């Protein structure tokens, strides 16, 4: 009699943590424990209250001469680097699942984006700047090439779309503008507004411009693709109203690795995997959980009374104005001190004036 050997069933692959359009998170190196409130009180903050929110771009494998293949995910620079005015971030990137954050990779390349370019205070810098980052995917992390997303409240639009290749445009010279993509369709998946589709209206060396994709905070870095063939076109970068700018995917590969124009698809291959995605936490669920934790940590904190704080702010401004007037009468006029006082008290009065108005409006709704 032949003995039959029973083989163990193959282990199922873990759900994909790396997925185009999925949420991406980053934490500060040393998150502050408290925040100073305008009332002078301190608000205790949990670590998760400092999480940086972005979305994942296209993922695949790099094939570079003389090097081992490397799995990477492409996204926006401002999603993987410390932004001005914010705590320094770790070089570790996570996806939210349940109440946890699961690590999936680390930054291996990116360009520098100035504060003036990101906050649109220098429009020409905003137009010209590149905005790209490359995240190496950790060993053992499952990825999928299916682009999809859920919006802030968990809403879903459309079906998963396979990312097939990179749209390798002719590389434009600095300052050159082209409309060879005018009217071509473009869709994006992002972790805040989900999937939206629109039309391309033009491009520059480091920008694919569209009208109506409506990026908002948290969508940054997410994949932009051509719905006709699944080609990755860009990653969400910045917006001015309905005008959106995506960082071209082909320029990421060219800039980061010196790949010649027209050779991008030889150097980067989107993953063939169609593994099911992890059940990512929506941004709304995450915000609700973090807000509840902040309330728990500050249960003894007395909420401010806007009208009372406004009265205090006005009284303080009057007192300092009287003191400065007395000093001026004694020949001790200091323009810098006066400007500092004006700016400080204007900010305080404006803040509490707005809060008081908001409180009154809320009472009438």
Predicted regions and their residues:
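Intrinsic N-terminal pre-sequences and regulatory tails
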Residues: 333-346, 358
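Active-site region of chymotrypsin-like
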Residues: 52-54, 156-179, 184-187, 191-278
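N-terminal activation segment of mature serine protease catalytic domains
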Residues: 15-64
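Serine endopeptidase catalytic core focused on the charge-relay Asp
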Residues: 51-60, 65-204, 226
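Short, low-complexity, Pro/Ser/Thr/Gly-rich segments in the mature regions of secreted, periplasmic
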Residues: 351-365
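Secretory targeting and sorting signals
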Residues: 1-15
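C-terminal subregion of chymotrypsin/trypsin-like serine protease catalytic domains
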Residues: 225-339
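Sec/Tat-exported extracytoplasmic proteins
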Residues: 60, 75, 83, 139, ...
């Amino acid at each position: 009699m032949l003995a039959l050997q029973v083989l163990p069933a193959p282990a199922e692959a873990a759900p994909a943590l790396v997925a185009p359009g999925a949420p991406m998170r980053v934490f500060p190196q040393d998150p502050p424990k408290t925040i100073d409130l305008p009332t002078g009180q301190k608000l205790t903050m949990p670590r998760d209250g400092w999480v940086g929110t972005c979305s994942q771009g296209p993922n695949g494998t790099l094939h570079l001469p003389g090097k081992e293949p490397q799995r990477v995910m492409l996204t926006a620079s401002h999603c993987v680097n410390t932004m001005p005015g914010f705590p320094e971030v770790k070089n570790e990137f996570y996806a939210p699942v349940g109440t946890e954050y699961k690590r999936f990779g680390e930054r291996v390349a990116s360009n520098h984006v100035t504060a003036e370019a990101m906050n649109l205070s220098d429009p020409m810098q905003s137009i010209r700047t590149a905005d790209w980052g490359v995240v190496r995917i950790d060993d053992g992390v499952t990825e999928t090439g299916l682009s999809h997303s859920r919006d802030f409240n968990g809403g879903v639009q459309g079906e998963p779309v396979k990312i097939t290749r990179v749209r390798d445009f002719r590389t434009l010279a600095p300052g050159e503008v082209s409309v060879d993509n005018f009217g071509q369709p473009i869709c994006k998946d992002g972790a805040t507004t989900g999937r939206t589709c629109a039309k391309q209206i033009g491009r520059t060396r480091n920008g694919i411009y569209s009208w109506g994709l409506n990026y908002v905070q948290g969508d940054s870095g997410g994949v932009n693709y051509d719905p006709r063939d699944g080609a990755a076109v860009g990653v969400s970068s910045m917006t001015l109203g309905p005008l959106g700018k995506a960082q071209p995917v082909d320029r990421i590969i060219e800039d980061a690795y010196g790949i010649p124009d027209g050779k991008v698809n030889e150097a980067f291959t989107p993953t063939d995997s169609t593994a099911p995605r992890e059940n990512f936490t929506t941004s709304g669920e995450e915000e609700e959980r973090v807000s509840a934790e902040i309330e728990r940590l500050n249960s003894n904190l007395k909420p401010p009374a806007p009208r009372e704080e406004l009265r205090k702010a006005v009284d303080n401004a009057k007192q300092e104005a009287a003191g400065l007037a007395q000093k001026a009468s004694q020949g001790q006029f200091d323009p810098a001190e006066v400007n500092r006082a004006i700016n400080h008290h204007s900010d305080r009065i404006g803040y509490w004036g707005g809060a008081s108005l908001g409180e009154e409006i809320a009472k009438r709704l």
